[in-house]
Amino acid sequence: MGIFSKPEVIILKESNSAKEYLELLEELLPKASEEIKSKIEKEIIIIKAGIAGENNILFELKNSNMDMYVLQDIYIETEDGRGAQIDFIVITEKITFFIECKNLVGNIDVDSKGNFVRTVTYGRKKYKEGIYSPITQNERHMEIVKESKLENRNLLAGMIVKKSFHSLNRSLVVLANPKTVLNDRYAKKEVKEKVIRADQLITTIKKIVAESRMPSLSKKEMKEFAESFLKKNQENRKNYIEKYEELTK
């Protein structure tokens, strides 16, 4: 790979459909009945937290001092209609990272079986609840991306994609809330490597890239690769439309 005169972070897509959804909710709020208002207000809090978390990650990426292409909020569907909403796709010279942003309130414990438990404190009381594994969620997204890449390819090209996919692509779950404490003392090594705090993101990316034995891409190849994801992106977000329709019922 040719050496860049200066490391360059290129944000190929920064727009976030969550912001558009937030605007819809804020517009709807004053017109809503009291019963619906409560649901909308809770949804607004959740969406604002998610946007703040993604902004934290975007800040880290923009200041990474690395050569990379960044795409935010990408939605990819397979031909049979299964979809994956990916918070960030980051293309570096050797590895592409699929980043799931979690701006969770409370502290997170991960046990030896990979179970995630959140503890939230209200006053003097502590409440614990199990949450769906963000690792499983992100890896399912990656499987959908892989299957979308296999579509319309011949047998040989498909075999190459299958063989190289997990060597070239990595899943990272980033806890974007700076107040969240992550307790992964009993978690397996592979879990610890996939769940990190936002302030560990760039160090983690640099370490994985440095340890990779994959050949380096040129800047032109990185751009073409990033643009291939952008071409697959669909702006019609079923998840937000369905949420909005549910709130307005």
Task: List PLM regions with ranges.
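Surface-exposed interaction regions that form or flank ligand-binding interfaces
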Residues: M1-A84, I95, T121-K249
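Phosphate-centric recognition/catalysis
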Residues: D87
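Active-site beta-strand-loop-beta-strand hairpin of nuclease catalytic cores
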Residues: V90-R118
